[in-house]
């Protein structure tokens, strides 16, 4: 039986209209990924006894931490500049579940090696290549570790990024960017405020390294009333060590006024951590004399802001900083003590599939401070798929709905998850 034209139009027009309403998943996916935030649920706290002996060394000064998921193992980097014992890192097991965190079990100590295979000396040895270890990251693709040293302005030692084997044997050193070389006087990086944070992209192809604070050329030190200059965060190719991109991040002003008012106070970036291929967690730590430490975690998207890799001096108007969103202010935890936290890493997943987030503090080998581990559950909104409404194809299985070709055939709703961008 021939269908009238009006019936054909009645069935085709709605289908075409529905198809015209289809969503482009590549466009909406990127925006949705950037808009997604996270929240943290506090799990618990654990501490390590002051000056505990591990493998014949004094444990302390932990400035970096990373998690080896395959081995269920943590790497803890000490910032001891070979003053107490040769520069080193520790391996440890840390039991974490949804209800708490247990005291870490130290397993071994590994000394950092120079290119000739010897250990690093300290000031007492009158060494000229004293390291200042700060950040450590495990790269599963090569079963190796990256670590940073802040350098020393007085000794003329530049901040560096190095790769080593799990036994501490040095593999290589990344090429040095001229802008991060130590300079005399008030130019170049500020002393002890250089390569403090580091994180690898999930695919291991690139590594981000953050300055703790602004270079002299880029801005001032922070105050209680005014933020300091921008800290540069640089993306390097993991294999070549060459820089790819650089963004500018604006740390907060110092949140608490010191007591007395002219007392010591600062604020900077001790650590960064990739949440996924583009989103990054940034830890800000401040200290105010007479008040103590303050910690805040921010979420940024590394695609935001301008690329400042080739901008020699950052001034308002010649760059766009990345935007940041507050995830947590540790003041809200009401802990008995909040110490000098410098390390941040993901830990094991909980039974519900959520990741854990672990922080560790640097006690500076002082009796008045503690090595504090804080564990959190990471709660992320579940990704929402883009739905594309399409007209049915010619092979539409009408029998499933009853053979009624004179009725408008039902449209197909096809879920298409947001594509995950990858770094080439």
Can you annotate each of these PLM segments?
Residues 1-9:
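Bacterial N-terminal signal peptides that target proteins for export
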């Amino acid at each position: 039986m021939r269908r009238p034209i009006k019936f054909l139009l009645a069935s085709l027009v709605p289908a075409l209209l529905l198809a015209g309403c289809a969503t482009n998943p590549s466009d909406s996916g990127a925006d949705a990924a950037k808009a997604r935030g996270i929240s943290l649920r506090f799990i618990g706290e654990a501490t390590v006894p002051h000056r505990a002996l591990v493998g014949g060394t004094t444990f302390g000064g932990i400035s970096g931490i990373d998690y080896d998921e395959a081995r269920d193992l943590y790497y803890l980097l000490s910032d001891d500049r070979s003053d107490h014992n040769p520069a080193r890192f520790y391996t440890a097991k840390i039991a974490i579940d949804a209800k708490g965190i247990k005291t870490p079990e130290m397993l071994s100590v590994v000394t950092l090696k120079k290119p000739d295979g010897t250990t690093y000396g300290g000031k007492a040895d009158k060494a000229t290549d004293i390291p200042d270890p700060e950040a450590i990251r495990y790269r599963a693709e090569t079963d190796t570790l990256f670590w940073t040293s802040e350098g020393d302005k007085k000794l003329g030692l530049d901040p560096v990024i190095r790769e080593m084997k799990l036994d501490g044997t040095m593999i290589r050193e990344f090429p040095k960017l001229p802008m991060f070389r130590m300079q005399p006087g008030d130019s170049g990086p500020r002393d002890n405020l250089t390569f403090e944070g580091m994180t690898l992209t999930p695919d291991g192809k690139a590594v981000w390294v953050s300055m703790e604070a602004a270079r002299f050329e880029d801005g001032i030190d922070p105050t209680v009333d005014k933020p300091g200059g921008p800290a540069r965060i640089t993306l390097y190719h993991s294999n070549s060590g060459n820089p790819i991109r650089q963004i500018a991040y604006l740390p907060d002003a110092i949140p608490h006024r010191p007591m007395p008012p002219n007392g010591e106070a600062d604020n900077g970036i001790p650590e960064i951590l990739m949440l996924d291929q583009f989103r990054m967690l940034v830890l800000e730590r401040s200290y105010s004399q007479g008040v103590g430490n303050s910690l805040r975690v921010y979420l940024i998207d590394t695609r935001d802001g301008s690329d400042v890799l080739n901008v020699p001096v950052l001034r308002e108007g010649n760059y766009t900083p990345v935007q940041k969103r507050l995830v947590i202010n540790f003041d809200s935890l009401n802990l008995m003590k909040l110490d000098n936290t410098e390390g941040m890493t993901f830990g094991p997943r909980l039974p519900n599939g959520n990741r854990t987030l672990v922080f560790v503090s640097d006690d500076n080998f002082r009796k008045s401070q503690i090595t504090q581990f804080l564990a959190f559950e990471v709660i992320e909104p579940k990704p929402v798929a883009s739905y594309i409404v399409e007209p049915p194809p010619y092979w539409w299985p009408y029998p499933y709905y009853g053979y009624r070709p004179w009725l408008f055939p039902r449209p197909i709703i096809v879920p298409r998850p947001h594509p995950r961008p990858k770094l080439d």
